[in-house]
């Protein structure tokens, strides 16, 4: 799913980068060195990298759909949740419509929000290919996670969802709070907000950013060229933002390597629960995968179902 975000962040936490490491005291100099992290980078450069990382991965919708074509477990989860909670459903970061169209086929009315032009075009094409009854259940709204509005629909959604790490494009506490405030405004009394983000993998976060990882071979769905895919990243441990680079390199060596940026905010479990509570929600269910299993150290995802806290004064 594509993940829209506010262009101007109210808190510049993402720009806090560590300084270049200094030699430690004698008793620490023999310890193994950590892989170099982000820095020293200017505030402006980090902001530019984060902004680019919110857009570039979603500029080629055909490639995006090809890369995630086997991702189905989350769709099954959100379909089951929608069956239990009912519609209409508000979907944040709907992207090209993986989840949207499945929910509409199940008979739910869905308001799908996104801001990435290529993904919105792909979503519209998918909707046009649906049976008429399913297509008519989908309303597409171009909007940002922090400022979206569905006129005439405040307080009307029993369920809001943000699938496939959408909230990892909220880079500051202010952005998280703004997004959750918009969700709260649109939820019906007793309504739920369900979303998933990754459980931070500490070994992955400290990988050497100079190396290439996850090298695989694939055929580009548009050009039909055989490509190598690989990735690496820098990690800002203060802003908790991974600045990821995706490399697309022609196997035959003819032509340049394309580098696509992707930025993701990492949320640790206790922190995430506190952020949700600060925005007037409470976590009513929490899972470690899309098979409804408990969250533990082996999990790759954090799947949360939240409701408005009973004592919240916010609307």
What residues fall within each predicted segment?
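A short acidic, Gly/Pro-enriched loop at the edge of an enzyme's catalytic core
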Residues: 150-159
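Class I SAM-dependent methyltransferase "Motif I" SAM/SAH-binding loop
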Residues: 93-95
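SAM-dependent methyltransferase
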Residues: 194-275
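Class I SAM-dependent methyltransferase SAM/SAH-binding core
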Residues: 102-148
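Glycine-rich SAM-binding Motif I of class I
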Residues: 97, 101
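A short glycine-rich, Lys/Arg-flanked "PGG" loop and its adjoining helix->strand segment in the class I
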Residues: 177-189
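Conserved class I S-adenosyl-L-methionine
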Residues: 8-12, 32-87
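C-terminal lobe and adjacent flexible extensions of AdoMet/dcAdoMet transferase-like proteins
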Residues: 263-315
């Amino acid at each position: 799913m594509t993940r829209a975000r506010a262009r101007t962040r109210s808190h510049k936490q993402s720009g806090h980068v560590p300084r270049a490491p200094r030699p430690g005291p004698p008793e620490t100099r023999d310890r193994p060195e950590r892989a170099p992290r982000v820095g020293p980078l200017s505030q402006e450069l980090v902001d530019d990298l984060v902004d680019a990382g919110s857009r570039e991965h979603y500029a080629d919708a055909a490639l995006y759909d090809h890369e995630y074509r086997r991702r189905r477990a989350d769709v099954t989860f959100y379909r089951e949740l929608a069956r239990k909670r009912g519609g209409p459903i508000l979907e944040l970061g709907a992207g090209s419509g993986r989840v949207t169209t499945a929910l509409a086929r199940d008979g739910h009315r869905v308001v799908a929000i996104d801001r990435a032009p290529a993904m919105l075009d792909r979503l519209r094409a998918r909707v046009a290919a649906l049976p008429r009854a399913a297509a008519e259940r989908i309303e597409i709204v171009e909007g940002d996670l922090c400022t979206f509005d569905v006129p005439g629909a405040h307080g009307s959604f029993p369920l809001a969802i943000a699938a496939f790490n959408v909230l990892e494009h909220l880079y500051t506490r202010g952005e998280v709070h703004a997004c959750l405030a918009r969700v709260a405004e649109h939820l019906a009394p007793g309504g739920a907000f369900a979303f998933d983000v990754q459980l931070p993998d500490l070994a992955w976060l400290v990988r050497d950013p100079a190396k290439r990882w996850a090298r695989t071979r694939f055929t580009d769905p548009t050009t039909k060229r055989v490509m190598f895919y690989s990735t690496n990243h820098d990690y800002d441990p203060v802003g908790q933002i991974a600045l990821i680079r995706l490399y697309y390199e022609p196997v035959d060596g003819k032509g340049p390597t394309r580098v696509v940026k992707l930025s993701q905010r990492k949320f640790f479990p206790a922190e995430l629960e506190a952020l949700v509570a600060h925005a007037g929600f409470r976590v009513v269910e929490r899972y470690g995968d899309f098979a409804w299993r408990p969250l533990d150290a082996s999990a790759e995802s954090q799947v949360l179902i939240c409701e408005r806290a009973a004592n919240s004064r916010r609307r």
